[in-house]
């Protein structure tokens, strides 16, 4: 099912499959969101839950209060992105989707939960709020959540990928960890200098020749994708997320993904117990945790 929100600036669409954003068009009909061309990547803006990235061998180990250690299988980016969400509510400027675990999810993730995703259209901005409720009455629930929106790049016909830059809200000097595409894991100790006293990064396909770029030490809480020719662009604000992942495929795809994540793939030096992973969010019984990010069209 497709749902549409519209105001004087934007027309935005969503679908119940994955509970995700599927289109952002301005008043001139220019599409900003990647449209899932399978030649390059058939995704658009999947929701990553209850993990971001990969676990070691896809296994999560739990230390729950009511049983011995337990191992569950959770594949890359979690299990909700290809599931059907329930459409809870639609009004003039917002839409709410929700999902609860099925039997297969509970076999591998030991917690009853409800994930609600609230999208709000306000002017030229779309806010995505993730509301994660722990439905357990006694167990604290660990989780990670992330967004994976991909944007057309170039946005305008006649422009090239290399005509675009990323602009950070702060001057940045940071390194990035080594990644292992074959396993999805990271080595947080083996790092390569990436940004050196700069606020912008010119895009080039060579950036993604190895893998995604994990920015886990950014000071900036927003990043802007902008054409140096037409000025067309958008901004992603991610105050609630400590990490930003930059990604495109290695075959010169006409998109870039700007991904706020609450956690990272498993690193070589950490263990497999989900509750002990760095940056894990823990929700008390019957409590709700909320995280949000914004996409703003700039023209």
From Swiss-Prot:
SUPFAM superfamilies: Galactose mutarotase-like (SSF74650). It comes from the Bacteria. It holds the Pfam family Aldose_epim. Transmembrane segments: none annotated. GO terms for molecular function: carbohydrate binding; isomerase activity. GO terms for biological process: carbohydrate metabolic process. This is Protein LacX, chromosomal. It comes from Lactococcus lactis subsp. lactis (Streptococcus lactis).
């Amino acid at each position: 099912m497709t749902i549409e929100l519209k105001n004087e600036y934007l027309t935005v669409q969503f679908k119940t499959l994955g509970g995700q954003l599927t289109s952002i068009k301005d008043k001139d009909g220019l599409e900003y969101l990647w449209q899932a061309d399978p030649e390059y990547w058939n995704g658009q803006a999947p929701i990553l839950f209850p993990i971001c990235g990969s676990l070691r061998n896809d296994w999560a180990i739990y230390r729950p209060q009511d049983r011995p250690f337990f191992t569950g299988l959770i594949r890359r980016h979690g299990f909700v992105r290809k599931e059907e969400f329930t459409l809870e509510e639609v009004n003039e400027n917002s839409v709410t989707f929700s999902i609860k675990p099925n039997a297969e999810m509970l076999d591998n993730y030991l917690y009853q939960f409800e994930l609600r995703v609230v999208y709000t259209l306000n002017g030229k901005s779309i806010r995505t709020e993730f509301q994660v409720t722990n439905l357990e009455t006694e167990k604290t629930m660990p989780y990670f959540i992330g967004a994976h929106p991909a944007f057309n790049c170039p946005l305008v016909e006649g422009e090239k990928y290399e005509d675009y830059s990323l602009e950070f809200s702060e001057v940045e000097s940071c390194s990035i960890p080594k990644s292992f595409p074959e396993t999805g894991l990271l080595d947080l100790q083996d790092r390569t200098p990436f940004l050196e006293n700069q606020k912008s990064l010119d895009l080039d396909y060579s950036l993604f020749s190895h893998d995604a770029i994990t920015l886990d030490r950014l000071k900036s809480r927003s990043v802007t994708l902008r054409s140096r020719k037409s000025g067309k662009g958008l901004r992603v604000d991610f105050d609630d997320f400590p990490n930003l992942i930059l990604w495109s495929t290695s075959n010169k795809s006409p998109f870039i993904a700007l991904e706020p994540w609450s956690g990272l793939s498993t690193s070589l030096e950490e263990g497999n117990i989900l509750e002990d992973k760095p940056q894990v969010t823990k929700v008390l019984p019957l409590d709700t945790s909320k995280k949000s990010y914004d996409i703003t069209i700039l023209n």
